[in-house]
């Protein structure tokens, strides 16, 4: 039988076909495929990995003693044998704290408490107005020589905030292509402020939201609930925010026991109360429960807002269905659309005294914590701050 003198090879696959292949690959498989040959590498430049499983960022806990400026580690649960580490992002990044994430972008606060948005994969950086640069409104802010902040309301009431306690419940959104963005945070207990592209000052939202216990920004809407038991939805689709919904709600908040009682007690405490917006737009109230002595955690999930209606009686959810909850982001995603993502599971990070041994998922069906992964790297990085995020990737 005569041999085919012109056999087709992997390198000869049409570009259109390669593009279809690349669009279906996860991040780990995408990285492997682009290294097959030069033609595949060229084709990969016209594609990006599909929207995938959430990643976990691991930051050193002690920023003051962090002399390694390239120490942030990324863990992809889909590719458990591989840890990714950023290149040198500079001393400023090493001394900064991550406050929130959106896509591949991080909202950071540096050692002088200045805010900026950073993409650790492309190294793009967007500066934000200084905290004390506030639009004339109900609150005035001055920075002290110790980098703390004095706030004055319109009745001349004064309150001192330590620098790292001034920015509360921060959230942001950014368009990956146009870099249009909005950043929002609670100014102490006074009000909520926001800034968009080109703003030199933070805009105060007068009287609508006076303080914030937690906030979620999704689909140009800000969801907030406050220490005053107010649940509010603000619509940011126009030039100025518009109140779309507001009502009183009951939030159970348990005060921490005294240090001595805390050591002796192993009863459940409400360690954190969070808002979560589902795929369909329902709003959930999530209580993270903690047995302090044993460090065992559990979660209660309540539905209290659905289809534009506030539910007088909160419904305790017995299941998350086919969705997975990303508690750090305040959202749920469909697990069956993301390979490797577990349905009916809560992905969370504990910002207090976290080590690699304390990273778990919570299976809402079995009501049990499951270890995320057995990490194996330099013990100098074991004291960590961890945060989940949903990266998206450009043509790199």
Swiss-Prot record:
UniProt cross-references to Pfam families, sorted A to Z: Beta-prop_KIB1-4, F-box
Coiled coil: none
SMART domains with a match to the protein in the record: FBOX
Gene3D superfamilies per UniProt: 1.20.1280.50
Domain F-box, first and last residues per copy: 7-58
PANTHER family: F-BOX FAMILY PROTEIN-LIKE PROTEIN, OS07G0183000 PROTEIN-RELATED
Protein name, as recorded: Putative F-box protein At4g22660
Taxonomic lineage from the root: Eukaryota, Viridiplantae, Streptophyta, Embryophyta, Tracheophyta
């Amino acid at each position: 039988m005569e041999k085919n003198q012109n056999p087709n090879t992997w390198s000869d696959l049409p570009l259109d076909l390669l593009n279809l292949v690349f669009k279906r690959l996860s991040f780990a498989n995408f990285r492997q495929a682009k290294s097959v040959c030069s033609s595949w590498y060229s084709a990969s430049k016209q594609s990006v990995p599909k929207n995938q499983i959430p990643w976990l960022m691991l930051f050193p806990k002690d920023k003051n003693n962090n002399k390694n400026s390239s120490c942030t580690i990324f863990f992809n649960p889909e590719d458990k044998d591989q840890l990714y580490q950023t290149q040198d992002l500079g001393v400023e990044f090493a001394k900064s704290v991550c406050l929130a994430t959106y896509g591949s972008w991080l909202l950071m606060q540096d050692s002088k408490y200045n805010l900026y948005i950073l993409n650790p994969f492309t190294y793009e950086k967007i500066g934000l107005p200084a905290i004390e640069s506030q639009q004339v409104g109900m609150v005035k802010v001055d920075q002290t020589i110790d980098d703390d902040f004095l706030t004055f309301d319109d009745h001349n009431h004064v309150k001192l905030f330590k620098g790292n306690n001034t920015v509360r419940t921060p959230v942001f959104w950014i368009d990956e292509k146009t870099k249009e963005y909005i950043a929002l945070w609670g100014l102490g207990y006074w009000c909520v402020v926001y800034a968009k592209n080109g703003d030199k000052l933070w805009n105060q939202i007068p009287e609508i939201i006076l303080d914030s216990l937690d906030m979620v920004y999704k689909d140009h809407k800000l969801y907030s609930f406050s220490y005053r038991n107010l649940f509010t939805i603000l619509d940011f689709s126009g030039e100025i925010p518009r109140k779309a919904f507001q009502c009183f709600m009951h939030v159970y908040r348990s005060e921490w026991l005294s240090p001595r009682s805390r050591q002796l007690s192993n009863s459940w405490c409400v360690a954190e109360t969070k808002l979560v917006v589902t795929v369909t737009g329902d709003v959930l109230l999530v209580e993270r429960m903690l047995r302090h002595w044993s460090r065992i955690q559990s979660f209660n999930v309540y539905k209290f807002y659905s289809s534009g209606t506030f539910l007088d009686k909160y419904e305790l959810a017995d299941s998350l269905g086919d969705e997975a909850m990303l508690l750090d982001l305040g959202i749920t995603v469909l697990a069956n659309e993301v390979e490797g993502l577990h349905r009916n599971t809560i992905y969370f990070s504990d910002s207090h005294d976290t080590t690699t041994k304390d990273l778990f998922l919570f299976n809402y069906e079995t009501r049990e914590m499951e270890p995320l992964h057995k990490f194996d790297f330099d013990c100098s990085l074991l004291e960590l701050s961890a945060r989940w995020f949903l990266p998206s990737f450009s043509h790199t």
